Design a protein with these regions (language model features):
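A structural micro-motif
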Residues: 76, 117, 137-138
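Structural motif
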Residues: 18-19, 118
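Residue-level signal for well-ordered alpha-helical scaffold segments within enzymatic catalytic domains
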Residues: 51-55, 84, 109, 132, ...
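C-terminal capping/extension of enzyme domains
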Residues: 1-16, 27-28, 36, 89-104, ...
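Short, well-ordered beta-to-alpha junction loops that form the rim of enzyme active sites
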Residues: 24-25, 121-126
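Proline-aspartate-enriched helix->loop->beta-strand connector
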Residues: 107, 111, 115-119
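Short, surface-exposed acidic-centric catalytic microdomains
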Residues: 26-96
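Short hydrophobic beta-strand that contains or immediately precedes a catalytic carboxylate
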Residues: 21-22, 143
Length: 168
């Protein structure tokens, strides 16, 4: 039986946050290695998230601090919907995550104390679980998955879509 994994990152919510990006759970590269303060959300090498964000905002993002500064500048928060999971087949796929505990208390606190106006999900999986947990929250929508496995859109198309939705 695979071990239970706990999310390694706290939500990042700048005081000026009006937008929340909500993912599922970090890949095993983030959770099954030694703790490292330089690691952060979407740290898997193949994941396109930071490449997309870098292109959207026309800036280089070399480290966690660069990413946090960019999100602070544009009022973007980030967290994940799952807090603890067990992986099936040691897989990073959302569908292979057995949910042990949702991150719903942190998300509820974020929505209750901040001025979040928009939530963007990075997968349909996240959207499904968020809508089940927070059925009354309506100002939320799906962004194309930054996973390279999501091949319905090219990276350039994802960049343009994110650019049309995220704060300027």
């Amino acid at each position: 039986m695979n071990e239970i994994e706990t999310h390694p990152f706290s939500p990042y919510i700048p005081e000026n946050a009006t937008t929340l990006i909500l993912g599922s759970f970090p890949g095993r590269e983030q959770t099954q290695t030694e703790p490292d303060n330089s690691k952060w959300f979407y740290g898997a090498k193949r994941n396109q998230f930071w490449k997309i964000i870098s292109s959207v905002y026309n800036t280089e993002l070399f480290c966690k601090e660069d990413k946090q500064q960019l999100f602070k500048k544009y009022g973007i928060g980030i967290t994940d919907i799952l807090l603890t999971v067990r992986r099936k087949n040691n897989s990073n796929l959302d569908d292979n995550l057995e949910i042990i505990e949702y991150n719903d208390q942190a998300i509820k606190a974020i929505l209750g104390k901040s001025s979040i106006k928009s939530i963007f999900f990075t997968s349909k999986y996240v959207e499904k679980h968020f809508c089940r947990l927070f059925p009354d929250y309506k100002n939320a929508e799906y962004l194309p998955s930054p996973s390279p496995r999501y091949a319905r859109m090219t990276k350039a198309e994802k960049i343009n879509y994110y650019k049309s939705k995220l704060p300027k």
